[in-house]
């Protein structure tokens, strides 16, 4: 049986290309639900995508991977690297992320999280249905597009687990963890 995944898609030209790229590695492993939004989507940001991920988790009473077409709205050089990171992590280490959220406690797992402010770097994560219920209670429109990455899990009282440097107390340590992964993966110095 495949794990569940919700992929949020911003329907820009770049977003549709990224969707195709991501589906190539997601569909063999996951039962993917697509949620698409018309650009510019500068009012709801990730809200419709995360809402659907929560609903899928609750309906099926099982963990769900939430991802989005990183780089569709504000393309830059780092975003293809993040997508490569997601591809590696969420295909090669699927069971680690899904096993980390077993249980009744509201849990989310991601490659890199900050422990003091439980953010999920790049906002790709696996959540269980308990977390989904708590997130739905707090989910609303926010003017700050980064609320979904930087505040949502904290305000929802969701415990986070990061596979890399889960004790990162600040963004700099978490970023160094990501750079270390990139360096070892691609031999970049």
Residue ranges, per PLM feature:
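ER/Golgi luminal nucleotide-sugar-dependent glycosyltransferases, focusing on the catalytic module
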Residues: 1-189
């Amino acid at each position: 049986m495949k794990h569940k995944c919700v992929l949020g898609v911003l329907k820009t030209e770049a977003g549709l290309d990224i969707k195709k790229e991501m589906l190539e590695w997601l569909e063999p492993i996951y039962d993917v639900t697509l949620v698409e939004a018309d650009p510019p989507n500068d009012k709801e940001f990730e809200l419709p995508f995360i809402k659907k991920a929560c609903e899928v988790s609750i309906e099926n009473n099982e963990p769900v991977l939430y991802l989005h077409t990183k780089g569709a709205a504000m393309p830059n050089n780092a975003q293809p690297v993040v997508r490569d990171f997601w591809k590696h992590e969420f295909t090669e280490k699927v069971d680690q992320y899904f096993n980390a959220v077993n249980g009744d406690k509201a849990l989310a797992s991601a490659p890199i999280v900050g422990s003091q402010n439980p953010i999920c770097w790049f906002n790709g994560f696996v959540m269980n249905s308990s977390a989904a219920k708590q997130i739905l209670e707090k989910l609303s429109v926010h003017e700050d597009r980064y609320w979904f990455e930087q505040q949502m899990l904290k305000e929802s009282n969701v415990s986070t687990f990061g596979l890399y440097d889960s004790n990162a107390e600040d963004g700099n340590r978490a970023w160094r963890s990501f750079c270390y992964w990139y360096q070892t993966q691609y031999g970049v110095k």
